[in-house]
Every structure is written in structure tokens, then in C-alpha cells.
């Protein structure tokens, strides 16, 4: 294969040309075919791809909690029981997705690299608002694929180091961004999770309270939505729960989430109506 630089052992010119601090912009020039939404039209809409389902986020004084169920579905079939849909974005933020699992995972990886690339180039991190805007730009780039059945919607949350509070951002399929001050949920079970959060949310609750109502919202969603997976006590599969505070991002261990699940189930045994 001929060397595009004309000089053996050197990187292509695009790697040596000064540009923006956006990795997505760089990729659009260096290898546009690698962008999630740049695959061109599909011969027919996709209807059988695996889908991730319900994600919730809850703000509390000093931070934010994000939690996601573990189920991926393919039509009426359970495609996977241990999917991880909530991920570290950078030191002070996290991101989850609902929708086409493959596209969602790819979008998350690109977003992580986008934030890391900016920090390496500029020597500083983006503000939380700027991170949310970068993610909106990436969601918009997937609109063509979404119109063909490969839709994915992210939920972004983080600790704002400038204001000292947890913030939540949601998006629609066309990349319209909106900030939610208290709680939000996306995915097939979101209407049930949001109803659960509406009933239990308090503005002054603690981090532990936020963790519990997040897990309980997923439990309620799984109770009414077949595409949302509830806690699997036999396989020891619990929701993914992450917190972001002034101390940064931290994913809770199963040993921490398990007792919360056990407590919820014990309470429901006494009061099946929730």
C-alpha cells in the first residue's frame, strides 16, 4: 500500500495539520466513514437490532445519580441480560443511552474520546454546558441512521464545578437539548420511571435517598414495561448505579447496590402497591 505522505514512516498529512480541539471534527476529515452516522443509507429500515431500555438520573444537593437497567431486547426477545448502559464520560460527568445498543455504545465511546481529546489539546476541561453541547452535536450526526430505525437517545449528567451542583441534560432524536433540574428518565420504561420519581423525589434528599429512588424507579419501570429488566437475584445482576459529586465520578459496586435492591423488595412484600 503506497504511503500517502510520500515519505516512509511518517503519519498522513491530516495528522500533522493544526485543526480544532474536537476529535469528532478531526475524524470527519481523517476517516469520516468511522463516525456513527456516516454509513450512508441502508437498503431498508432496521427492525431487529438489539435495544437498550431505561435510564434514570436524579439530582441531589451536591451531585447527581444515574442508574440504568441491564436488559437489551430484540423485538419480543431478551437479547442480553447484563448490558451496561451507564458510563463514565469524564472525571465529573456520566452518560447513559436508550435505543439501538450498538449505535449507543459507539456514540458513548466517541463522546469519551471527544472529551479526552479536548483536554489533551487544550490543557483544560470543557464546562458542563459545553460537554452537553458537544453531545448534542454528535446526536444530530446520527439523525440519518435514526430515521432508518437505528435511533439512540443519550442522557447526560454531571457535577458542575463552577456552581457546585448536579445537573441533568436530556435530548430528543433531533438533538434538541433540555436541562432537567430535578430528575429525568429515558427509554421504553421512562413513563413509569418518571411517575415513580415524581412521587418520591424531594429537593433536599441525601445521596443515599437519591440512590434508592433511582433504583426504585427502575423497579417500577420493570414492573410495567417488558423491555426493562428488573434486578435478577438469581444471577446477581443489579442496576448500574453511578454518582457524580465534587469528588468526581464513582460507580457503585454490586455490594452497595444489592442491599438497596433487597430493601426495596422487602418493602414491596409488605406493600405490593409501592
UniProtKB/Swiss-Prot annotation:
Residues 1-52 form a propeptide. GO terms for cellular component: cytoplasm; proteasome core complex, beta-subunit complex. GO terms for biological process: modification-dependent protein catabolic process; proteasomal protein catabolic process. It is an enzyme of class 3 (hydrolase). Pathway: Protein degradation; proteasomal Pup-dependent pathway. The keyword Ion transport does not apply. The active site is at residue 53. Its EC number is 3.4.25.1. GO terms for molecular function: threonine-type endopeptidase activity. The 20S proteasome core is composed of 14 alpha and 14 beta subunits that assemble into four stacked heptameric rings, resulting in a barrel-shaped structure. The two inner rings, each composed of seven catalytic beta subunits, are sandwiched by two outer rings, each composed of seven alpha subunits. The catalytic chamber with the active sites is on the inside of the barrel. Has a gated structure, the ends of the cylinder being occluded by the N-termini of the alpha-subunits. Is capped by the proteasome-associated ATPase, ARC. Component of the proteasome core, a large protease complex with broad specificity involved in protein degradation. NCBIfam families: 20S_bact_beta (TIGR03690). PANTHER family: ATP-DEPENDENT PROTEASE SUBUNIT HSLV (PTHR32194:SF0), METALLOPROTEASE TLDD (PTHR32194). This is Proteasome subunit beta. It comes from Parafrankia sp. (strain EAN1pec). The gene is prcB.
